[in-house]
Every structure is written in structure tokens, then in C-alpha cells.
Amino acid sequence: MSIINAFDNETKEILHPTNMVNKIEHFPEVAILVFKEKFFNYLQEEYGMKIIGYINAGLSIPIYKLKFNNKEFAITRTTIGGAGTAGTAEELIAMGAKKILIYGTCGTLNKEILKGHFVIPTAAYRDEGTSYHYIEPSDYIEVKTASKLCTIFDELNIPFIKGKTWTTDALYRETIGNMKKRKEEGCIVVEMECASIMAVSQFRNIPIYQFLFGDDTLDGPEWDKRKIDASSKELMERNILE
């Protein structure tokens, strides 16, 4: 049986997130997932976050409570890839999260996209496996929270680009041929989580918001690292938090 026929909405899952974690009293309604250690360490240094729980999706990862502008957030790091990040989101929902915000990096498929831009995905090409266990098969999954997130960025006067993303499981098999096909379909970036987490969002009926940071580029015969100046990136990240 092909993986695209793996969705089973007729029977219950054998292992549920509540088998791994318990609901936490007064758990913040909004949870934030980040990938970069440097950004996470900055938050810890600036705001003195306290541990309120642990993620158990493969690794024991601390969850912290972040207090900012009289609001409380749960924040944790997640691993690269759709399966691990989907598992992390599942456990946060089981603990009590009502909304999830995910911030990560991506590779651009269009060299004309200026490095350092934030990107808001509007749809994700499902070149991974996790999403097919949560929703019916399709080439793309719509990011239903994209419109609201674009409005928020506009209100904050934060420049961004919106468009389709290519979600892949195979970091080292992003071939020139597949890159060109995704570009022809309108994809502007590639990453490894969007399709998976948006499938979780739809299945669990929990809004998940994602924005990305355009970093390296695949638009060419060879990979272009194209790293943005660290100080500029840090300033943009602080602006998002504020």
C-alpha cells in the first residue's frame, strides 16, 4: 500500500499523546517552538524562563514558561524534520496548548528573494510522510493560518514574503530536477516541517502558525550558503518577539 493511502480516520490511534504526557494545570495557551539554540539561549538570558515540563517525543526536552508583556507563553526547542516536530506539537496540545507558533529557517528557491526576509507559507508540498497519517492525500496542504499571520506582520510593519513551500524529508536529496519542478509549481522556499505540522493542526483542530527565515538558497547548480549577518538576524528576531 502506498503511503498516500495511509490515512485511517475509521479507527483510533494505539498510542495517544496523553499516554506520554499529562495535562498541566495553568499551562500557557500559546506555545512557541524554535529550532535555533542561539535564539533560545537569548530568551533564557533575557527573561529567566523556568521549566514547567518536558517533551518526550524521542528526546527529553525542557519546556519553559516565558513571561513577556504581562502574558505567559510555553516555549521549547524542537528537532529538525516533520515527524519530530509533529510529535512535539502533539504533546504540547495534550499538555494544554491552544495555539502554537513555530519559527524556523528555510532555503530559498528564488535567488531574487533577498536574504534575511521572513517568509509566511501559504501552502506546503507534501514531500514527507507524516501528513499522510493525519489528513486525506493531496499534493499540497493549505496553511489556513497564513492569512491571519500576514495581517499581524502587516500591523507590526515587519517585511515578509508569502508563498508556497516545499516540505521534504530528505535534506540531502533536494535534487536540481525536483527543485525546478517545485519552482514551476510556485514554491519559493524549501523546509522540513510545514506540511506535517499543518496536518496536525487540521486533524487536532488547533491553530498552528509558522513563519520562516530565508537563509541559504538552492536556486542554482550548487548550494549557496548565503548566511545573513548575525546582528541583523538577531535584530529581526527581537522585533518579532516584541
Q: Where are these predicted regions, by residue range?
A:
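Metabolite-binding pocket within alpha/beta catalytic cores that recognizes anionic/polar moieties
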Residues: 1-143, 147
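Glycine-rich beta-alpha junction loops
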Residues: 36, 107, 166-171, 196, ...
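Short, hinge-like loop/turn segments at secondary-structure boundaries
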Residues: 118-121, 208-209, 227-229
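Active-site rim beta-loop-alpha module in soluble metabolic enzymes
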Residues: 139-184
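A C-terminal functional module that forms or caps the active site or interfaces directly
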Residues: 177-180, 185-209, 213-217
